[in-house]
Amino acid sequence: LKFFPKLGLFIYIFIYLIFPKLAITQNTNVDIRKNLENALNTRNLKLIDNFFIEEESSKVQEKFKKIIKDFPNSKWQIKRLSGVKSKEKIFNIKVNGNRIVNGEKFFLESNFKYLFFTQNDKINNGNIKNLLTTIRNDKNKIDIIFRIPEKVLTGTTYDIDIILNEPLGNLIIAGGIISHQDESYLKQNINIEPLASGGIFKTTRASSKPATQIWSGLITHPEGTISFTKSVEIVEKL
């Protein structure tokens, strides 16, 4: 349990990506994907600063510095995907890194889609979709599956299943999960309880209005600890 406060900080680092106010901007006359990926991986803060509109630059710089501080060796991979709409562009972004905390080595993996439009040679209206971030110290010994939908209809019920595939036998595991749609999660604690069923299984209802719902949780196991964050887009039609 002594690792939970630090893990909570790691979860926070990536939750901020959900909010569209942190839209990335850059001149579209150059290869945005390649230059952005290079700037992130070389920690070129001055170059990264040039990618953002003036009013957002300081906020983005602050957030990026937090990631660098907690995962100094993090690596970013950006792939270009086709947009669903003619003017919409999509990047598929993956972030990997590791960090030793209190003698334990934690591995970060984050995957998400970044959707945006271009206007006046700038990328704007950026949104993070289908985010899944895990931080774990089990060396991937725990066979775990996250069955959480990418998007659901407003007002409908949907299932959240975090499944441990291997039989538990006499093993004792514990875990918990919370949901939030804004920074109210900073005031919430994740209650850790025994998981006799071999995972976390929950049925919930989507909000009545379009939104992005975020689920964050922890699972503790004799092999290690896994923290996770997953976004669910709530839409009026699929």
Residue spans for each PLM region:
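Short, low-complexity N-terminal intrinsically disordered segments enriched in polar/charged residues
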Residues: 2-5, 9-41
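Short solvent-exposed beta->alpha transition segments
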Residues: 45-100, 105
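Short beta-strand edge/turn micro-motifs at domain boundaries
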Residues: 106-143
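Short beta-strand segments of immunoglobulin-like
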Residues: 147-153
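Short edge beta-strand/loop segments characteristic of extracellular beta-sandwich folds
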Residues: 158-167
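Aromatic sugar-binding surface patches on proteins
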Residues: 194-202
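Surface-exposed, short loops/turns at beta-strand junctions within beta-sandwich domains
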Residues: 205-212
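Short acidic/polar inter-strand loop motif in beta-rich domains
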Residues: 220-229
